[in-house]
Amino acid sequence: MGRKCRKLLLKGIPICGVILLILWGYSLYNTLRFMVPGKATEPFTLSLSDVSDDTSAPGEMEKIPRVIHQLWKDENIPERWSNTVNSCRRQHPDENGWQFILWTDEKIMSFMNENYSWFMPVFHSYPYNIQKFDAARYFILYHYGGVYMDLDIGCKKPMDPLLSKATFILPSTEPIGYSNDWFAATPKHPFLYQAIHNLSKFNHRYFTKYPTVFLSAGPLFLSYQFCKYLLTPHEPVRVLPALLYGNGPNSFFSHVTGDSWHGTDAKVFIWIDRNSKSVLFFAFLAAFAILFLCLRVVFKRRRKRGIAASHSQIQELYP
């Protein structure tokens, strides 16, 4: 009886493992299908006609406040970003109701201590300053609403048409995911509530600086949270496609090189991304070679066992 139970367990455990793996894979696919631009994201992706000056419905009210939040360590913005910052100020003047707020390290610490002291142990535990900047932007926009944008993003035209289209807007990135270098929201938006309350769960070191930053509080963290949010009943959210967010003629924005926090590991990941076809080809060859060697070892062992078994049978027949 015990032997039969052991056999059933030996057969059942792998089967259960496969079933659980399939269920986990389906759940992950169901969440991450929103990562890739396509049919899943079409219903809430903004088009050029959505943001044309003459497409606003009569009486359509702006949902998102006319406040632009930006972050830097102090009041002295580097010269390399002066053109982008000034372009946004020109397109969004005070007389049109726009307000600019530059959040320095000192202002961020004061704001966080005063309003979100419960998060400060996690905030102080981040090993890299960029993680603190990433987390702070979520809290600031959750608290005040408005538009967050990095200093290396310039403005080619006013963002006014975007403010009435949804309660939250996030740009998609190619080939997959969403960016956290620009996003817009109403105050106390439920998606940002979800994001800030999940930061502590993702506060881990993921080998090197680049994946740690991206997964703990950066774009991959926000992308995953956004995909999860889309699976639940939610307020109107919209995605800003590359057509309206990239460097093209119809875009609201221009982009210059930023990412001052990138290290050597980031350069490796970026190189892999830019040479993805070659990397996949050589990875396939390596996987095939490893599989071939493993099969060769297995067949050799089986052959040796077969020869040994034959010899033992012969010895039993002819002692």
From Swiss-Prot:
Glycans are attached at N115, N198. InterPro entries: Glycosyltransferase_domain, GlycoTrfase_DXD_sugar-bd_CS, Nucleotide-diphossugar_trans. Its EC number is 2.4.-.-. It comes from the Eukaryota. One of its GO terms (molecular function) is mannosyltransferase activity. Gene3D superfamilies: 3.90.550.20. It is an enzyme of class 2 (transferase). The keyword Membrane applies. The keyword Membrane applies. GO terms for biological process: mannosyl-inositol phosphorylceramide biosynthetic process. Keywords: Glycoprotein, Glycosyltransferase, Golgi apparatus, Membrane, Transferase, Transmembrane, Transmembrane helix. It is a multi-pass membrane protein. It is found in: Golgi apparatus, cis-Golgi network membrane; Golgi apparatus, trans-Golgi network membrane. The chain crosses the membrane at residues 8-28, 211-231, 279-299. One of its GO terms (cellular component) is trans-Golgi network. Belongs to the glycosyltransferase 32 family. With imt2 and imt3, is required for the synthesis of mannosyl phosphorylinositol ceramide (MIPC). Catalyzes the addition of mannosyl to phosphorylinositol ceramide (IPC). MIPC is essential for cell morphology, cell-surface distribution of ergosterol, localization for plasma-membrane transporters, and lipid-raft-mediated endocytosis of plasma membrane proteins to the vacuole. This is Inositol phosphoceramide mannosyltransferase 1. It comes from Schizosaccharomyces pombe (strain 972 / ATCC 24843) (Fission yeast). The lineage of its organism: Eukaryota, Fungi, Dikarya, Ascomycota, Taphrinomycotina.
